[in-house]
Amino acid sequence: MIDQLFRLLYRLAYRGMRVYWALARPRTHGALVALWSGGEILLVRNSYTPYHSLPGGYVRRRETALEAARRELLEEVGLSLGAEGLARVVDVHHGWEGKRDHVEIFEAELPERPRVRVDGREVVAAAFYPPARALALDLFPPVRQAIERRWGAAAGRGKAGLPAPGPAARSGG
């Protein structure tokens, strides 16, 4: 019952924030963590959004994006990683949902799939997905970019996992 109340409050707060973002167009800064294990990526579902994302959230005042990424990873899925295990792979500015958002995505490769835990309030699900299945989901746009970047590079593929263009396509003829 308490968890359901929290989920309702998160949804109401999110809707209110979307109105605020549309009117005020604030600058925001977020940090996310792309965890890969066995060729699969960890995605989360928040109780208040219709899409899948990576563990992460806002960068607090006087906090670096890397510190925020590590903090959010612990808060959202109960995992602690050292800073040395995370590399920034995406740094993008976008206007999705009406805000002027700066998103930094850090990536780590884990040799063994960790056990993750979710609170059932803010984060309601977390699971590892193969890239093709992940890309078929409704994703937060910077998350899609990170998956396409990693999957394409690992498989010698171009955008969205499509085969990279051959020499004739690259040269325009």
Regions found by a protein language model. Name each.
Residues 1-32:
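Acidic, metal-coordinating catalytic segment for phosphate/diphosphate chemistry
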Residues 31, 36-76, 173:
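Conserved Nudix-box catalytic region and its N-terminal flanking loop in Nudix hydrolases
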Residues 38-40, 109-114, 131-133:
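Short loop segments at secondary-structure junctions
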Residues 50-51, 120-173:
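Nudix hydrolase/Nudix homology domain
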Residues 78-79, 128:
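Glycine-centered C-terminal helix-capping/turn motifs at helix ends
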Residues 80-90:
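A short coil-to-beta-strand element that immediately follows conserved catalytic motifs
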Residues 92-115, 127, 150:
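Active-site-adjacent beta-strand/loop module that shapes the phosphate/pyrophosphate-binding cleft
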